Amino acid sequence: MADNRVNPVPRHVAIIMDGNGRWAKERGSPRLKGHEAGAQSVRVVIKACRDAGVEFLTLYAFSVENWSRPKAEVDGLMRLLVRFMDDQEHELHENRVRLRVIGRLADLPDVVMNSLNRVMERTAGYTDHQLVLALSYGGRTEIAHAARRIAEQVKAGTLQPESVDEACVAANLYAPDIPYPDLLIRTSGEMRISNFLLWQLSYAELYVTPVCWPDFREPHFRAALDDYARRSRRFGGIEPEVKR
Ligand code: IPE
Ligand code: IPE
Ligand code: MG
């Protein structure tokens, strides 16, 4: 069979991990059971990224809008985050993955932030793979935050208004050193971005699967990478992208 792959493995994969609630509902279980089951999919995907050679994995774990959910669900999600850090830290070491977080981190309970900080510090030395958790994250919030930082620099006289260009905005995002996602995967079928990485996804390839997040396994991830490999990324031009 002819291999018509035109793209190499994506350097950065971002995932909207959706469908935990529906997965639980189908089983007659409380929503939190779906979130619990989703933790296993996170482990699977971290390992699959390492095996495939994906350098950056950004997971949408909690949006600024998700604070509007019932308190019991929000509290449960925060507890799960702490548990995930406790249970999975050793796997991050085994896979040599550096943990990062992006979002409005001041919103997070101290107990969550402490556990994230602990794992971030201990994994800070790994350079091959990075896991970026988007927590209390909103794309509009991030861009507004960047605008505020830029305004402060202009006010302080360290930046001229005519120097505010795309590179300047990009430099004031939460994690300016991370390349933009090449591939965005969304599970459980919704065809929307839901305020995720609005700036960074401008030229990402989108892949939506009907599979709910707790059922997402390595073959599903592989299928997304295979699909990506055959996309024609033109970036507004007319020639297929030259191999990087
Ligand atoms: C995604 O699953 C996880 C979070 C948003 C934290 P949902 O909880 O949104 O599941 P559905 O979309 O209701 O099925
Ligand atoms: C997006 O899922 C947020 C996360 C996966 C953390 P949502 O379930 O919150 O998004 P909507 O409400 O379907 O747009
Ligand atoms: Mg959802």
Give the predicted meaning of each segment:
Residues M1-R244:
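Flexible, compositionally biased loop and terminal segments
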